[in-house]
Swiss-Prot record:
Alphabetized InterPro entries for the sequence: Glyco_trans_51, Lysozyme-like_dom_sf, PBP_transglycosylase, Pep_trsgly
Gene: mtgA
Reaction catalyzed: [GlcNAc-(1->4)-Mur2Ac(oyl-L-Ala-gamma-D-Glu-L-Lys-D-Ala-D-Ala)](n)-di-trans,octa-cis-undecaprenyl diphosphate + beta-D-GlcNAc-(1->4)-Mur2Ac(oyl-L-Ala-gamma-D-Glu-L-Lys-D-Ala-D-Ala)-di-trans,octa-cis-undecaprenyl diphosphate = [GlcNAc-(1->4)-Mur2Ac(oyl-L-Ala-gamma-D-Glu-L-Lys-D-Ala-D-Ala)](n+1)-di-trans,octa-cis-undecaprenyl diphosphate + di-trans,octa-cis-undecaprenyl diphosphate + H(+)
Organism of this sequence: Burkholderia orbicola (strain MC0-3)
NCBIfam families membership: mono_pep_trsgly
Protein name listed in UniProt: Biosynthetic peptidoglycan transglycosylase
Length: 245
């Protein structure tokens, strides 16, 4: 039998106390972060977000790399955005948006299998609400930790806000190119018209851009964009909008 000295016992107790303390600090910080997110979302029930995490990061990069450049963004009410664009985005990004709870389990499982096969994260299976959660609070980093936080924020959004409000914030904050955010800025940047006047074909082409907005901004008029837009345009008629629409 090996005797344990008093010094060793004291060291073990100290390490245990330190672990408990560190765990408590981490748990407290995590909880405070979640409460901050929840409070922000509750505020956005009646106040429009001024910016998003993506916008702030992009603004910093633009000021560093091309100082005269600025973020293009103009908030417009939900009813001042073309129904064509709303239908195009639902047809392209989240066909069950109006009725789902913010998650598409089948898409998440498919993304998991794809990521496992590739040995890295290449797909996320994100719904419109999940995309909004990421845009508002998180980064472009691809990791399972970030994905877990995204799922928590998605639950908060779906619990606190109704579908129309979620879609309104999404439409006004999603990225559509280098420094271009929201439907109004995108409509004026690409077509020189307000978002309320976007036609079906214009809306379908904008919807194609969302997975890789900066790439499509730099490669406008690509054959793929036209082909994919045609597919989205055919699906738009079946796209179900939030109830009030």
């Amino acid at each position: 039998m090996v005797a344990v000295s008093g010094t060793q016992r004291t060291r073990t107790v100290s390490l245990a106390r330190w672990a408990v303390y560190a765990g408590s600090v981490f748990a407290g910080a995590w909880l405070a972060t979640q409460l901050f997110y929840l409070a922000q979302i509750a505020l956005w029930s009646f106040v429009n977000p001024g910016s998003t995490a993506f916008m702030r990061t992009d603004a910093w990069r633009l000021s560093r790399d091309t100082p005269p450049a600025q973020i293009r963004h103009q908030w417009v009410p939900y009813d001042q955005i073309s129904r064509n664009l709303k239908r195009a985005l639902i047809a392209s990004e989240d066909s069950t948006f109006a009725t789902n709870n913010g998650y598409d389990v089948d898409a998440i499982l498919q993304a998991w299998e794809k990521n496992k096969a590739r040995g890295r994260i290449v797909a996320g299976g994100s719904t419109i609400t999940q995309q909004l959660a990421r845009n508002l609070f998180l980064s472009r980093e691809k990791s399972y930790i970030r994905k877990g936080q995204e799922l928590i924020i998605t639950w908060m959004l779906e619990t606190v806000l109704d579908k129309e409000r979620i879609f309104e914030i999404y439409l006004n904050s999603v990225e559509w190119g280098r420094g271009v955010y929201g439907a109004e800025a995108a409509a004026r940047y690409y077509y020189k018209i307000p978002a309320s006047r976007l036609g079906a074909w214009q809306s379908a082409r904008l919807a194609v851009m969302l997975p890789k907005p900066r790439w499509f901004d730099a490669h406008r008029g690509s054959a793929y964009q036209a082909q994919r837009a045609a597919v989205i345009a055919r699906r738009m008629g079946a796209a179900e909008l939030p109830q009030s629409e």
